[in-house]
Design a protein with these regions (language model features):
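Catalytic strand-loop-helix junctions within cyclic-nucleotide turnover domains
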Residues: 83-94, 110-115, 119-137, 162-166, ...
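Active-site core of bacterial EAL-family cyclic-dinucleotide phosphodiesterase domains
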Residues: 166-208
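A conserved signal-transducing helical linker
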Residues: 2-8, 12, 49-52, 164-171, ...
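Catalytic core regions of nucleotide second-messenger enzymes
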Residues: 72-76, 104-121, 149
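A structural signal for short, well-ordered beta-strand segments
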Residues: 31, 80, 120-124, 190, ...
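A short linear hydrophobic-aromatic micro-motif
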Residues: 68-71, 188-190
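Catalytic/regulatory signature loops of cyclic-dinucleotide turnover enzymes
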Residues: 136-161, 165, 175-187
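Conserved long alpha-helical elements within nucleotide-processing catalytic cores of c-di-GMP signaling
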Residues: 2-30, 37-63, 73-77, 81-82, ...
Length: 208
């Protein structure tokens, strides 16, 4: 399906809609980045038609039929972005609301597909600064989502510089390594491993 889910906007339409809402101060906006764990195994065990159905069900449940949703967008096969209105809601209210939706949806998936454990990952960014570019705001929601990967005990994560620092540092190191490879600045040294019992070199460890 490639993210072309019935009822969802394209990338530019989504960004423009969110920008318009934020600039006019029409609603308080919270951005969502969402995907699910182990989606590949639904395709493998139950077939691609079932996988497509799960993706459309996510689109319907979290965005298209959600009364708080102002705009939504599908990316790739299993990535979603959305904007909810959070008028008269605290941050804690929004987190609780999303957590309840996750429990409902995960329970339904576990009943339909008992062979595959499913967890919904959600990152949130409260878009309270209209001067911030919408693409950067969406990236912050996505960064919050990525920071919870593998943490099945976290129903959703709100972006903050503190809780995303570790991921940012990892991303910076990865980018620096890629640049170093491209510029041929990588040197590899072999550190020998000595076998005391056999009194010989048993191997080596590569140091970059």
């Amino acid at each position: 399906m490639g993210g072309c889910y019935l009822g969802m906007a394209g990338h530019d339409v989504f960004n423009n809609k969110v920008r318009e809402i934020v600039n006019t101060n029409e609603h308080r906006v919270v951005l969502l980045a969402l995907d699910i764990s182990n989606f590949k195994y639904i395709n493998d065990f139950y077939g691609m038609d079932e996988g497509d159905k799960v993706m459309q069900d996510i689109a319907d449940f979290y965005f298209i039929n959600e009364p708080l949703c102002l705009a939504s967008h599908g990316i790739g096969f299993d990535q979603f972005r959305g904007a909810y209105k959070a008028d008269n809601m605290t941050n804690e209210d929004v987190v609780g609301y999303i957590a309840r939706k996750n429990r409902i949806f995960e329970k339904e998936l576990s009943e339909r597909y008992p062979l595959v454990y499913q967890h919904v990952y959600v990152g949130l960014y409260f878009y309270d600064d209209p001067s911030l570019d919408v693409r950067m705001a969406v990236d912050r929601a996505n960064l919050a989502k990525k920071s919870t990967k593998g943490r099945f005990d976290i129903p959703c994560c709100v972006y903050s510089a503190d809780n995303c620092n570790e991921y940012l540092e990892h991303m910076d190191m990865s980018n620096e390594f890629v640049r170093a490879c491209e510029e041929e600045r990588i040197e590899i040294f072999l550190q020998p491993k000595i076998s005391v019992s056999h009194n010989c070199v048993a191997g080596a460890e590569a140091l970059v």
